[in-house]
């Protein structure tokens, strides 16, 4: 059974944060992986994707200067390093597997990141 489990969310102050996605039930090292998010009351926004060997990483242009996607195939884990997060980055963050037919075939449940200076 394919499972994707995100972690690292919660209430954070503006600045940096690290999200993780632990994968199981498939050969993680053979698949492209992706991050996406959905802010409250808004549609889903694709963040970026990474190829199996980490040699190709694509980002949504507006986010590429604040987010870094990486992976550790030995640990079956995908990462999203976020810098300069602000209140508008409050969202439910998901990881997803890109299937062989060019679409996302499995999604995690997501982890909620709430950015607040209070």
UniProtKB/Swiss-Prot annotation:
A GO CC annotation recorded here is: extracellular region
Instruction: Output the GO biological process annotations, alphabetical, semicolon-separated.
Output: immunoglobulin mediated immune response
Q: Which Gene3D superfamilies does the entry mention?
A: Immunoglobulins
Keywords carried by this UniProt record: Adaptive immunity, Immunity, Immunoglobulin
Q: In this protein, which residues make up the domain named Ig-like?
A: 1-111
| InterPro entries according to UniProt | Ig-like_dom (IPR007110), Ig-like_dom_sf (IPR036179), Ig-like_fold (IPR013783), Ig_sub (IPR003599), Ig_V-set (IPR013106), IgHV (IPR050199)
SUPFAM superfamilies recorded: Immunoglobulin
**Any matching Pfam family:** V-set
User: What span is annotated as the signal peptide, if there is one?
Assistant: none
Q: Which GO terms describe its molecular function?
A: antigen binding
Miscellaneous comment in the UniProt entry for this protein: This chain was isolated from an IgA myeloma protein that binds galactan.
The protein's name: Ig heavy chain V region X24
* Species of the source: Mus musculus
């Amino acid at each position: 059974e394919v499972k994707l489990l995100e972690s690292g969310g919660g209430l954070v102050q503006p600045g940096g944060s690290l999200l993780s996605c632990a994968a199981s039930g498939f050969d993680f090292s053979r698949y492209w992986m992706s991050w996406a998010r959905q802010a409250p009351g808004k549609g889903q926004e694709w963040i970026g994707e990474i190829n199996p060997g980490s040699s190709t990483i694509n980002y949504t242009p507006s986010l590429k200067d604040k987010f870094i996607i990486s992976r550790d195939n030995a640990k079956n884990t995908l990462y999203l390093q976020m810098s300069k997060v602000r209140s508008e980055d409050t969202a439910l963050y998901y990881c997803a597997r890109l299937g062989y037919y060019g679409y996302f075939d499995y999604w995690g449940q997501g982890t909620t990141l709430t950015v607040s200076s209070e």
